[in-house]
Amino acid sequence: MNLDRLTELRKKKNWSLQYTADLLGIAKSTYAGYESGYRRPSLEALAMLADLFDTTCDELLGREKQKQTAPQAIELATWSSLDFTISVDGQPLSEDEIIQLITFIRTKRKVQEELS
C-alpha cells in the first residue's frame, strides 16, 4: 500500500487522524496503523478509504493505471458474442458494467494476492 499517498490525501483535506477515523467509523489507532503500515486495511476498508478520499483502490495501492490489453479485448469480444444475458435486479448488464465487473474481480484477486 502506498502509505505516503494515504497521509498526503488526509493532510490535503486538513483532517486530523481522529477526524478521519471518525468518518470511517474506526478507532484512531486503527487508522494510524494504516498510515504507518502497521495494519493493512481489509478490502471493505480499502474501498471506504478510496470513497472517502475520492480516489481509486488502485491509486491507494500505488498502482499505475493500466490500458486495456489485447487479451482483455479478446475476452470482451468473446463475451459479447455469447447468446445469453446477465442481469442484476432484473436489469441486463451493459457492456460497460460487464467491463467494470471484470475489472473489479481482477482488482480484488490482486489485492487478495498481495495481502496473503
Curated annotation (Swiss-Prot):
Name of the featured protein: HTH-type transcriptional regulator AnsR
Instruction: Cite the PROSITE patterns for this sequence.
Output: HTH_CROC1
UniProt xrefs under Gene3D superfamilies: lambda repressor-like DNA-binding domains (1.10.260.40)
Q: Give the matching CDD domains.
A: HTH_XRE (cd00093)
Q: Which GO terms describe its molecular function?
A: DNA binding
Which positions make up the DNA-binding region?
Answer: 17-36
Query: What keywords sit in the KW lines?
Result: DNA-binding, Repressor, Transcription, Transcription regulation
Record-annotated HTH cro/C1-type domain positions: 6-60
What Pfam families does the entry give?
Answer: HTH_3 (PF01381)
Function, please? Transcriptional repressor for the ans operon coding for L-asparaginase and L-aspartase. NH4(+) may influence this repression.
